[in-house]
Swiss-Prot record:
Organism of origin: Rhodobacter capsulatus
Sample GO molecular function, one term: heme binding
Protein name in the entry: Cytochrome c1
Stated role: Component of the ubiquinol-cytochrome c reductase complex (complex III or cytochrome b-c1 complex), which is a respiratory chain that generates an electrochemical potential coupled to ATP synthesis. c1 functions as an electron donor to cytochrome c.
Binding-site residues for heme c, renumbered to this chain: C55, C58, H59, M205
Annotated TM spans: 249-267
Alphabetical list of Gene3D superfamilies matching this protein: Cytochrome c-like domain, Cytochrome c1, transmembrane anchor, C-terminal
Protein topology in the membrane: Single-pass membrane protein
Gene name tied to this protein: petC
Amino acid sequence: MKKLLISAVSALVLGSGAALANSNVQDHAFSFEGIFGKFDQAQLRRGFQVYSEVCSTCHGMKFVPIRTLSDDGGPQLDPTFVREYAAGLDTIIDKDSGEERDRKETDMFPTRVGDGMGPDLSVMAKARAGFSGPAGSGMNQLFKGIGGPEYIYRYVTGFPEENPACAPEGIDGYYYNEVFQVGGVPDTCKDAAGIKTTHGSWAQMPPALFDDLVTYEDGTPATVDQMGQDVASFLMWAAEPKLVARKQMGLVAVVMLGLLSVMLYLTNKRLWAPYKRQKA
């Protein structure tokens, strides 16, 4: 018992330290969070627009089939539009013929490789930790999941207009981001022990979002904050397209198990209670 208690405390402490790596990521309420949460179709469509017009230049989604854009629970775009959209993307080498052809809706989104290209965004929402809970305890991840959408949202909106006071000139060719933890930091922004004194660090990626960068088809004002929320939601759907269906299945399973437990209890009372009283 003592060893178990020590192990549990150690895990909590170590987990807290890891969670503190992204302690500057603040909580944000998305529509798909919680047991009954669902994706907002309008938001997914706006997020897809931001991805296709802004992010897709440098970031691919090589694990996401294009056809899923018309699936239930997602953006549910018109299949004809999806086919035309696929045909307008980068061409692909056919696996059977070895010849170059137009991309089809059954193919994956293009990938982006080479100098200046960013990481693939297919599962980015599951690969980054967001809000860690009180004091970086990691409780938020335990009860609400890893929080990747929060990280994405805070990252794309986390480029301040001015650099921190400790390095007003910044780093040439890099851009300060308030939640990015693994980038470069000037010596002027470190204490005597060499630990950085800023919340974030400098990243190679420049700010990608600006007010009115896109024109939303539904008329929603395209502020940086709005575009950040929308693209984060879209990337969460891209990483977890069956999230809502899985929640519903889990809820049904819990209800069925609850009913089964009640039935077993009542059956036990009905069949065995008289014999237990006789034995007593």
